[in-house]
């Protein structure tokens, strides 16, 4: 099976934000005049990149992983230029909570951040509800 990658501009919308689709189910272009009016909550990644917590949610196969992979180098560069660090984990390979806890909360980058020396940007790909509860519990 050939996997095609379309280099479309992608937009983000808050979970409870307003998003307007056309009759055909397509997003009104947020960069166009009418699209800005009908989709005021829909923005490109650059607009929200500085927010302290972001979650890219959606159905399996929508391209969330590809989106993160495409942005990773730019994100790493920007974060490093600002004096921060990144920590990327693909949770698809985790079968146990213990391993996730060890690899995330025992990670040297995470431990250095916990001592308060820099801003840490954590990227968790393939976060399912079970694993999200583990992460939420330890961040409390």
Place the predicted regions along the sequence by residue.
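P-loop NTPase signaling cores
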Residues: 1-140
């Amino acid at each position: 099976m050939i996997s095609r990658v379309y280099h479309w501009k992608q937009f983000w919308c808050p979970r409870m934000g307003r998003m307007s689709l056309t009759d055909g189910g397509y997003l009104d272009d947020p960069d166009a005049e009418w699209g800005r009016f009908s989709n005021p909550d829909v923005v490109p990644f650059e607009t929200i990149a500085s927010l302290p917590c972001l979650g890219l949610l959606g159905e399996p196969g929508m391209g969330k992983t590809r989106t993160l992979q495409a942005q990773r180098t730019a994100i790493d560069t920007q974060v490093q230029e600002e004096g921060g660090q990144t920590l990327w984990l693909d949770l698809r390979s985790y079968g146990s909570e213990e391993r996730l806890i060890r690899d995330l909360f025992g990670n040297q980058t995470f431990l250095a951040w916990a001592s308060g020396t820099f801003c840490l940007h954590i990227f968790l790909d393939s976060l399912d509800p079970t694993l999200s509860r583990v992460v939420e519990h330890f961040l409390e």
